[in-house]
From Swiss-Prot:
It comes from Bacillus licheniformis (strain ATCC 14580 / DSM 13 / JCM 2505 / CCUG 7422 / NBRC 12200 / NCIMB 9375 / NCTC 10341 / NRRL NRS-1264 / Gibson 46). The gene is fliT. Belongs to the bacillales FliT family. One of its GO terms (biological process) is bacterial-type flagellum organization. It is found in: Cytoplasm, Cytosol. This is Flagellar protein FliT. Its main location: cytoplasm. Residues 25-91 form a coiled coil. It comes from the Bacteria. May act as an export chaperone for the filament capping protein FliD. The keyword Coiled coil applies. GO terms for cellular component: cytosol. Keywords: Bacterial flagellum biogenesis, Chaperone, Coiled coil, Cytoplasm. Homodimer.
Length: 113
C-alpha cells in the first residue's frame, strides 16, 4: 500500500512542479529523477490490490495525460530555445565573415588564349 501512496504523492508533486514552470536545467534534472523513481515504484507494485489502491492508481493514470501535455510544452520550449541559439550563431558568423557563403553564379571562363 505504501508504494502506491508514494507513487501517487510523487506524481501529484511532479505535476504541481512542472505545471506552468519555465524550462530550466534544474527542472529537466528533476523530471529525470522523478521518472527514474517512478519507474522503480511501478516495478515494485505487486497484485492483489485493494479498492483504495486501485482508486489511487486510477488517479495516477488520470494525471498521466496532464503530465504528458506539460512535458510536450517543455519539449517545445527547449526546441524553440535551441533554434534561436542556432539562428543567433548563424547571424554572428555572417557578421564575422560576410563573404563565406558566396555563390559563383555570375562567373564565366574565358576560353581564348
Amino acid at each position: 500500500m505504501e508504494k502506491i501512496e508514494l507513487l501517487y504523492s510523487e506524481t501529484k508533486h511532479m505535476l504541481a512542479q512542472i505545471k506552468g514552470a519555465p524550462e530550466s536545467d534544474e527542472l529537466v534534472q528533476a523530471i529525470e529523477d522523478f521518472l527514474k523513481k517512478r519507474d522503480g515504484l511501478i516495478r515494485e507494485i505487486k497484485p492483489p490490490l485493494s479498492e483504495t489502491e486501485k482508486r489511487q492508481l486510477q488517479q495516477v493514470t488520470d494525471m498521466e495525460p496532464l503530465i504528458m501535455a506539460e512535458l510536450k510544452r517543455l519539449q517545445q520550449a527547449v526546441k524553440q530555445e535551441l533554434l534561436q541559439a542556432k539562428q543567433k550563431r548563424a547571424m554572428h558568423h555572417s557578421y564575422i565573415n560576410p563573404y563565406a557563403n558566396m555563390t559563383i553564379d555570375g562567373t564565366y571562363y574565358d576560353k581564348r588564349k
